[in-house]
């Protein structure tokens, strides 16, 4: 009979339906849900539909696309939500509330993604305003606070952390992130995760200051839509002139969390972004990336594209092995 230590080491290498984010694995898969970029009523199912997928560890709910004031957008999933009476841009979503709890019961790590390309508020005029906004976000999506009257889009459901996917300059974003981090650290109980989704160009203009100031658990880099993406990878050589994972590895070692992990972000289908590559091409990309201690798996945009692209998920899983 194998020892418990040996068994634990083996399980750390094997994706499981009962496992969310695994810091010791190089086979994590994170997928964004909520924007239905495939753009058909049938291409985005309710959140819980995807939580039976044993290959997916992390689901990023996209997006809280406004913060001051708060705004949500979940594409067709929002059709089953109800606007709050005093803020028609903020949705109350009992179905998503129930589904978050179902997904967490299935072992999935559920993050709320902040920003997105439709975020246009530009941030905050002062550090204090950014900190107040972070307190509000924590009250809305963290543990229910006794006596609080804040609107909670997901009711009593509590997310497992926050993803920062800002695509444009956001004033005082680092102060916002630091305050939100302090709230999660002080909460006790379960671990709350922080991730960010910069574009592959380094440094990233939108979240660069944030990730240089606030410790992240992982960075899910958008290696698409740019020459530094996976489509620029050259097989058979350790010197990459375009695909710049090495640059991000170097940054990670001096970041606020020197143990931060990196996910290679890819389009989940040909319509998800420029620079889509097939699963067979990804094998060489991932084999190269596995040579770095920071590598922890893949991120895909988005769930609707993934489920339309028959067989691609299996190809990604196999490429990560």
From Swiss-Prot:
GO MF, one annotated term: chitin binding
Domain called GH18: residue spans: 27-321
Record: active site: 167 (proton donor)
Localization: Secreted
Class of the enzyme per the UniProt entry, highest EC level: hydrolase
An individual GO BP term: polysaccharide catabolic process
Keywords: Carbohydrate metabolism, Chitin degradation, Chitin-binding, Glycosidase, Hydrolase, Polysaccharide degradation, Secreted, Signal, Virulence
Pfam families per record: Glyco_hydro_18
Name used for this protein in its record: Endochitinase 33
Organism: Trichoderma harzianum
């Amino acid at each position: 009979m194998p020892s418990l230590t040996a068994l634990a080491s083996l399980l750390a290498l094997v994706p499981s339906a009962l496992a969310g984010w695994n810091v010791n694995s190089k086979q994590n898969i994170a997928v964004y849900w909520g924007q239905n970029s495939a753009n058909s009523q049938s291409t985005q199912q309710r959140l819980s539909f995807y939580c039976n997928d044993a290959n997916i560890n992390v689901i990023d709910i996209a997006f809280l696309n406004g913060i001051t004031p708060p705004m949500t957008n979940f594409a067709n999933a929002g059709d089953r939500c109800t606007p709050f009476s005093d803020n028609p841009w903020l949705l109350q979503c009992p179905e998503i509330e129930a589904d978050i709890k179902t997904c967490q019961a299935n072992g999935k790590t559920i993050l709320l993604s902040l920003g997105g390309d439709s975020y246009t508020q530009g941030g905050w005029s002062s550090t204090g305003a950014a900190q107040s906004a972070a307190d509000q976000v924590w009250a809305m999506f963290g543990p229910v606070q006794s006596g609080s009257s804040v609107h909670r889009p997901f009711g009593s459901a509590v997310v497992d952390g926050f993803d920062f996917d800002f695509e444009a300059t956001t004033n005082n974003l680092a102060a916002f992130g630091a305050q939100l981090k302090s709230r999660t650290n002080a909460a006790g109980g379960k671990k709350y995760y922080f991730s960010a989704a910069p574009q592959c160009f380094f440094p990233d203009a939108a979240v660069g200051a944030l990730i240089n100031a606030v410790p992240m658990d992982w960075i899910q880099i958008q290696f698409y839509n740019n020459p530094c993406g996976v489509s620029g990878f050259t097989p058979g050589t350790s010197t990459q002139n375009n695909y710049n994972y090495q640059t991000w590895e170097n940054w990670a070692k001096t970041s606020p969390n020197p143990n931060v992990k990196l996910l290679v972000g890819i389009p989940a289908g040909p319509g998800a972004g420029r620079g889509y590559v097939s699963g067979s091409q990804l094998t060489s990309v991932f084999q190269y990336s596995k040579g770095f201690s920071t590598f922890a798996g893949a991120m895909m945009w988005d769930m609707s594209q993934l489920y339309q692209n028959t067989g691609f998920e299996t190809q990604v899983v196999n490429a990560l092995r």
